């Protein structure tokens, strides 16, 4: 699905991500792909380029591996923090597997065990966790709420490897189910639960069930609002990262089909780790691999003729640290010119 905001007429699409820099309305950029294809390097590099043309940029990793800290050589956590050497580019790392316990704890001192000592705490947690993905949904909703209040001009998500990448799209439904179950519990047992909780010191932060339900409702509204923005091609796009191999191409196609079904714009693909052995190269393995890569590159070009396809070379060293990331990021904008084959 290509964005009408980007593509017009019969223009051939540039093999760069320059269009993302030119799209001034863009607010949310998701970078996703199979593990090990250079997704984090690509998202960091894109963030560096966007920081050149935007007032404030936030890079968020939702990958539990937390590779942003490794990429920049700087520790990040769940609070947004400026990246060394930049005055308008910040980063944060959150764990989308964070627990619903944080919501129940309301940030109190007992966050590690908000239900400690409460006989029916386990029952509430069992109820909440019986809904698949509810803990991730709550955690992600809290992050989106925080991000909304931070008012960054553009936000880039370095997502978890494919499979988990698109789970955020199901969150509004998951939250509605959770809300429905808890509302049902509250209407049936609310007075009794509140009196028992009151006798035992209540929930952490002095909350009762109604307050928890109200908090969940406000989170559901926030995530519903953001979800509507995700479906607006002027505000949101998804950059697919892959390598020229069968499994990676298969995952990319599956992801693009899913994004299309969710009405989320995607019109850029970054193909990493391409080999370009010279004519006189004596490396037979390199030539064989290049032959295989060319086959899948041709398939990518046929399948995604209405996409900006960026070809990135295999590098001899890891892309870590500000200088190497900046160098890599330049190739996302100025196409790499390989030696003659």
UniProtKB/Swiss-Prot annotation:
- The record's top EC class is hydrolase
Query: Could you say which residues bind Zn(2+) here?
Result: 283, 286
Gene3D superfamilies, per this entry? P-loop containing nucleotide triphosphate hydrolases
Which positions are catalytic residues? 63
Name the GO terms of the biological process aspect: cellular response to oxidative stress; pheromone-dependent signal transduction involved in conjugation with cellular fusion; post-translational protein targeting to endoplasmic reticulum membrane; response to heat; response to metal ion; retrograde vesicle-mediated transport, Golgi to endoplasmic reticulum; tail-anchored membrane protein insertion into ER membrane
Q: Which UniProt keywords apply?
A: ATP-binding, Cytoplasm, Endoplasmic reticulum, Hydrolase, Metal-binding, Nucleotide-binding, Transport, Zinc
Query: Coiled-coil ranges per the record?
Result: none
Query: What terms describe the molecular function in GO for this protein?
Result: ATP binding; ATP hydrolysis activity; guanyl-nucleotide exchange factor activity; identical protein binding; metal ion binding; protein folding chaperone; unfolded protein binding
Q: Where in the cell is it found?
A: Cytoplasm; Endoplasmic reticulum
Q: Which HAMAP family does the UniProt entry name for this protein?
A: Asna1_Get3
Function summary: ATPase required for the post-translational delivery of tail-anchored (TA) proteins to the endoplasmic reticulum. Recognizes and selectively binds the transmembrane domain of TA proteins in the cytosol. This complex then targets to the endoplasmic reticulum by membrane-bound receptors, where the tail-anchored protein is released for insertion. This process is regulated by ATP binding and hydrolysis. ATP binding drives the homodimer towards the closed dimer state, facilitating recognition of newly synthesized TA membrane proteins. ATP hydrolysis is required for insertion.
For this protein, the record's NCBIfam families field holds:
GET3_arsA_TRC40
The family line of this record is: Belongs to the arsA ATPase family.
Q: What is the protein named?
A: ATPase GET3
* Source organism per UniProt: Ajellomyces dermatitidis (strain ER-3 / ATCC MYA-2586)
């Amino acid at each position: 699905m290509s964005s009408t905001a980007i593509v017009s007429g019969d223009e051939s699409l540039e093999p760069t991500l320059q269009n993302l820099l030119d799209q001034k309305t863009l607010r949310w950029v998701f970078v996703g792909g199979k593990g090990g294809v250079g997704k984090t390097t690509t998202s960091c590099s894109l963030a560096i380029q966007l920081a050149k043309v935007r007032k404030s940029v936030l890079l968020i990793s939702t990958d539990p591996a937390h590779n942003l800290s490794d990429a920049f050589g700087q520790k990040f956590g769940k609070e947004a923090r400026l990246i060394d050497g930049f005055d308008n580019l910040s980063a944060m790392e959150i764990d989308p597997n964070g627990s619903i316990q944080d919501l129940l704890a309301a940030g109190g001192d007992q966050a590690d065990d908000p239900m400690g000592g409460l006989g029916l705490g386990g029952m509430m947690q069992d109820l909440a966790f019986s809904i698949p993905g509810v803990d991730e949904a709550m955690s992600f909703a809290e992050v989106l709420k925080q991000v909304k209040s931070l008012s960054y001009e553009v936000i880039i998500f370095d997502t978890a490897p494919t499979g988990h990448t698109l789970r955020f799209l199901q969150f509004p439904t998951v939250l509605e189910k959770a809300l429905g179950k808890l509302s049902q519990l509250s209407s049936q047992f609310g007075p009794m639960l509140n009196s028992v909780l009151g006798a035992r010191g209540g929930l952490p932060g002095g909350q009762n069930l109604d307050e928890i339900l109200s908090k969940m409702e406000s989170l559901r509204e926030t995530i519903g609002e953001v979800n509507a923005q995700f479906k607006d091609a002027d505000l949101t796009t998804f950059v697919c990262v892959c390598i020229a191999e069968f499994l990676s191409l298969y995952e990319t196609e599956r992801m693009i089909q899913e994004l299309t079904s969710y009405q989320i714009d995607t019109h850029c693909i970054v193909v990493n780790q391409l080999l370009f052995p010279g004519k006189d190269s004596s490396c037979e393995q390199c030539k064989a691999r290049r032959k295989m890569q060319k086959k899948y590159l041709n398939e990518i070009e046929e399948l995604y003729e209405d996409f900006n396809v960026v070809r990135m070379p295999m590098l001899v060293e890891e892309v870590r640290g500000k200088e190497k990331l900046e160098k890599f990021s330049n190739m996302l904008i100025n196409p790499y010119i390989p030696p003659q084959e």
